[in-house]
Amino acid sequence: MSHNRPELNEQVIKAQHAAAIQSGVGRSNKHESAEKHVSGEARFIDDKPELPGLLHLCPRLSEHAHARITRIDVGPCYAIPGVVSVLTWQDVPGINDVGPLEPGDPLLAHDKVEYLGQIVIVVAAGSPDAARAGAAAAVIEYEVLGPLLDVEQALAQNSFVQEPHVHQRGDVEAALARAPHRITGSFHIGGQEHFYLETQTALVIPGEDQQLQVFSSTQNPTEVQKLVAEVMGISMNQVTIDMRRMGGGFGGKETQAAGVACLCAIVARQTGRAAKMRLSRRDDMRITGKRHPFFVRYEVGVEDDGLLCGVKIDLAGNCGYSLDLSGSIVDRAMFHADNAYYLGDARITGYRCRTNTASNTAYRGFGGPQGMVAIEQIMDHIARERGLDPLALRKRNYYGKQDRNITHYHQQVEDNLLDEITEQLEQSSDYQARRAEIRAFNARSPLLKRGLALTPVKFGISFTSSFLNQAGALILIYTDGTVQLNHGGTEMGQGLNTKIIQIVAEVLQIEVDKIQITATDTGKVPNTSPTAASSGADLNGKAAQNAAEILRDRMTQMLCQLHQCDASEVSFRNGIVRAGEKHYTFADVAQLAWLNQVPLSANGYYRVPGIHYDRLAGRGQPFYYFAYGAACCEVVIDTLTGEYRLLRADILHDVGASLNPAIDIGQVEGGFVQGVGWLTCEELVWSEKGQFLTDGPASYKIPAISDVPADLRVTLVENRKNPQDTVFHSKAVGEPPFMLGIAAWCALQDAVASVGGYARHPQLDAPATPERVLNGVLQLAGACDDLP
């Protein structure tokens, strides 16, 4: 066995002395899979070569939203050529439940179905066509029960998946009683389909001793590992999850990915053959949960100048038929019901309503967007009622730096950038001049009306379940100076792997092309937290940084011993390692370490310090820090049709010291457009019987390129490091930009309000579809006729 000899390469050393490392943190490196994505070379689960004997799975879904199952006859399925196995709940060897926190999510329906689209049976066959035909051949009979579909009705009937929860500060009733002005209202916020490009997919290969190799498109490999083990009745060490990349996630693969993996595992163990399940787009949209729709009621007390003195908000989330993650999601909506504003005395109540729809789940922002939309609606309502400028009102109520800086859940708002960001964006977007210009335009334009809004974002970063704020990483250095990297995060296109490679390159001072990242693997880094809550780079980046520092310190100690020098005389820079007067390439040092029996692998670990939250008391510090941003959006509406266009958007967003500005700007742009889609064109529709009607791209409209503002200006806050000890003082960027899209919705309300001379608030439900915009115009036009 031969290894590299530790000889110096003088030319390499001279060249690397001359130029700084080109690929560490702070540089706009391209996405590590960018070329593979555009060329089609990036392999997803469905691209893997088919193994001999591979079985394809297809589900048969419930045809009713609420019914008892009276008969299941799978005999006809076996008459279809190629059908090998049909699964019912009786074929589950372990626990027939995939609830992430509490039981209540049956893998296969037993005696009752709780929503239209619930999986009742699964057929395994030698081809996808045979599996589909087999699933359609089964005979399933029901006794139909009455479904509960409306969140307001569920709230009235106290139909909950979890008890209501309250955040309270001060005496809100007394504050409302003494307020010179009181404003009340209610409205609906729609849900949102994840619409990831790759639908829910899993491939399971059986091994010896009941071991299972699971390839799962999941944001949460450890949870899939745990649930597969429970469903199969085996231990977790017999299940290994492999996840190289997802074709999108957005939260929809945090808990929802486990079901298909578990079904494949049953078939693989039952038949001894590899099993794959890739849901069709229609089945995926019918089976899986969405962003939670919300019903919001509010009552606020306001001083003459618009200052909030008392706020009461009820947030009723439509959770679907089971808990899933709804407890934490509605909690986060409550945490963000203040957004950027000091509420005064406040009571925020969260309701987790149970309905006969798919169990709603995580989605980018995790409830935070719904909470923010509630308070932004309130701000616009106050501005119209009191005749105040919406931006001036918002700034009047911002959190302060020295006082008025405690949230309604009793966390201090630190490193507050709201004033600075708003002032900079107000100037760069020319807000005041455009506001005057738009009012003049609307006064002379009878049919087209323009609207403008500038809204802030203050988003808390951390899992609110504190134990999840931890991560691990594994780094291996080989004797040729190359590095293999594994961590507990998952790549879904957001650039996480690219950033973590840059972090390791920065610590070791080597180029990124020397680092190879491998699939997320529960056999390498165990007990991972989900890649969610904008924590991917914060947690896994810190763990990788820790592992790299351990290895660098080991190398440093070795060189100190070899050269009888102090650690301060050893430096890693630009691919060169200096020890006293001696200079080495990084590969030389790796070879020396091996020859001197220094271990060249290290496990890194990180946990977020200082966060805590007492849920019973409704107080604590659930967030490590806040990310800030603001967006200014201009729209134009057609008052005859309700159609509209986004004309311009100016965005200023805080990412701390950016790890990769190009990726961060991409996340801001994408998050903004996705947020705009949620609040404008993405409408979920159910029939009176509970059938999900918008179950494909023909009926469910995500933003197209024509929906993006023609003039989109994105700027990152410069020269502002995160004061917290995050990875190289960066800030999370996954979720906060999503809420920037609220500015578009507020701008639409501003345009509609102009029809009534800005004297009435249109209070549009979200999404603000052209139909809703037109109805708002007609209502205000009628109300305007009644004005004295």
Give residue spans per PLM region.
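Short acidic, glycine/serine/threonine-rich loops at helix termini
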Residues: 96-101, 134-137, 216, 225-227, ...
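Flexible, low-hydrophobicity surface segments
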Residues: 1-164, 182-185, 270
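Thiamine diphosphate
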Residues: 247-272, 276-278, 496-504
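C-terminal catalytic domains of large/alpha subunits in multi-subunit enzymes
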Residues: 2-6, 89-90, 233-238, 268-275, ...
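A glycine- and small-aliphatic-rich helix-loop capping segment at beta-alpha/alpha-beta transitions
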Residues: 220-221, 229-233, 256-267, 293, ...
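Glycine-rich loop/linker segments at domain edges
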Residues: 27, 32-40, 166-202, 293-378, ...
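Helix-loop-helix junctions that connect adjacent transmembrane helices in secondary transporters/permeases
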Residues: 152-232, 398-482, 693-705, 711-715
